[in-house]
Amino acid sequence: MQPKVNIMHLPVYQPGKPIEDVKRELGLDEVIKLASNENPIGYSPKARAAMLDEIDHLHIYPDGASVDLTAVLASKLGVESNQIIFGTGSSDIILMICRAYLTAADETIMADETFSQYKHNCEVENTNIIEVPLKDGKHDLNAMLAAVTERTKVLWICNPNNPTGTIIGREELEAFLAKLPKHVLVVLDEAYGEYVTDPNFPNGITLIDRYPNIVVLRTFSKVYGLAANRIGYGVGEASVIRTINQVREPFNTGRLAQVAAKASLQDDEFLARSQASNTAGLNYLHAQFDRLGLQYFKGHGNFIMVDVRTPSMQIFDLLLRKGIIVRAGWKHYPNAIRVSVGTAEQNEKFIQALEEVLIELAVLQ
């Protein structure tokens, strides 16, 4: 049996190392996972109650169109229901966009260090991929614009960018969109957007009326803490969403995911608590990296990329032995690790372990 030639080289996605694997392999009783940008304070109690209420109905297929959830979200966002599509996480929407729009004759543009699933799904469609280097950890919109040709079909912007955590401001984004040819679909991935406190951060959904070639992606995995439920959504002009819907698999969001997401949208107290906890954690980690003399990209999501001045996989392994899981191995940032914001206690334990490791390696005196 012969698979498609263009997928034979593709790596299998590697998530953050599971806690139980680390405990078993290293004989540790406590492990702190700061690798997958999860919500350290959990998820909404209203979502828990909603799932428990639904637990006896798992033998029945979910609403294939997510009608109730769509209505609640549309009201909250100020858009029409036909402008929304749900997926098994926002990564499912990425897959659908590639399936709906890209062929081997097309080109697609993205940053050279960004969320890996853009490139992965474009490669599955055998599309020609143009990777534009980041500039100071940010998307270089001028260079991306210069790379556009008549063959360019989709352009990807992760805002805040994963893994660097940097953002593109409102004026910069709008100036870019005004110059971009209208045949290019812009995927504006705002998976971490709810965490951003910078007043210049653009809400992509408010731009759709003026720029109907935008699709905005968001997720319930991050600030809402529903990572295990796998549910995210896209928002765009109705005809664009209809096109993406044409390639959506049936029943692609589960019953528990739908009711949990709906309840989460109605729990403003939990959302505010998640945001406040994250902001405090970012401020603490920024201050500690300053104290240690480490360079970093200011985090605007729920993670920070920090330069540890030594090969990052070595730091990863040493931190792992101390029961701290982070992410490392970035092609263009070989000396950087990405650490998720944890609870206050977890953040303190991470800094203590990192300082010990850097002193051990003589990176710090």
Q: Which role fits each region the language model picked out?
A:
Residues H59-E107, E125:
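Phosphate-binding glycine-rich loop
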Residues A65, N213-D290, L294-F297:
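PLP-dependent aminotransferase class I/II
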Residues E30, E80-I84, A104-E107, R151, ...:
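Short acidic capping loops at alpha-helix termini that bridge into adjacent secondary structure
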Residues L318-K322, W330-Q365:
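PLP-dependent enzyme catalytic core of the Aspartate aminotransferase-like
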